[in-house]
């Protein structure tokens, strides 16, 4: 947290510093799911801005024609008021928005190295469970996971932070698991993304 002048406003983490005051700024987790249509992100962002909430982190995707978004925003509006303000967006029942107050945790520096795991092969039950179990047993923390079924082909891409020195052992275990599943898997170190 930094303050350069007695009346300068600076927001760092989950605290807001202003003219001789220090107070906590709430963080809210907002999830929106439902039938995809153009304008959902704009509609949600406008409601949050109108309430004075600052959108900090977000992710959004389409899952087999369904819209799914999770975001974190900061401000001083109770979660029930935010949920009520979002309710008109789902008037026809095609969207569901939920809001929950969360504790600010800040960014946690990874203790290991980031890796990218890619898998493709014939779809079958248990692929995600088997691959993520290998990563979990090694102490890996999955930071992003995307899966997609395209016809009979199943694709999985995961970003994972692995403990120092664990890359080769994890690669060996993933190769064994991939053989059992009848899929192809690769793992490689990757650079930390800006986003």
Task: Report the location of each language-model feature.
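Long, intrinsically disordered low-complexity tandem-repeat segments
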Residues: 2-18
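A conserved regulatory-domain signal marking ACT and ACT-like small-molecule sensing domains
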Residues: 20-195
């Amino acid at each position: 947290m930094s303050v350069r002048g007695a009346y300068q406003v600076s927001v760092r983490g989950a605290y807001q510093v202003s003219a001789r005051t220090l107070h906590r700024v709430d963080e809210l987790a907002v999830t929106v799911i439902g039938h995809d249509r153009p304008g959902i992100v704009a509609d949600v962002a406008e409601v949050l801005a109108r309430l004075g909430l600052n959108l900090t982190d977000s992710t959004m995707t389409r899952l087999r024609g369904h819209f799914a978004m999770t975001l974190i925003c900061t401000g001083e509006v109770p979660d029930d008021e935010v949920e009520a303000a979002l309710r008109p967006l789902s008037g026809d029942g095609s969207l569901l928005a939920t809001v929950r107050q969360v504790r600010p945790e800040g960014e946690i520096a990874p203790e290991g190295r980031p890796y990218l795991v890619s898998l493709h092969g014939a779809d079958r039950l248990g692929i995600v469970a088997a691959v993520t179990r290998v990563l979990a047993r090694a102490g890996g923390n999955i930071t992003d996971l995307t899966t997609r079924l395209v016809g009979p082909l199943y694709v999985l891409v995961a970003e994972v932070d692995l403990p120092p020195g664990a890359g080769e052992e994890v690669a060996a275990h993933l190769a064994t698991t991939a053989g059992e599943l009848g899929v192809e898997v690769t793992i490689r170190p990757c650079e930390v993304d800006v986003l």
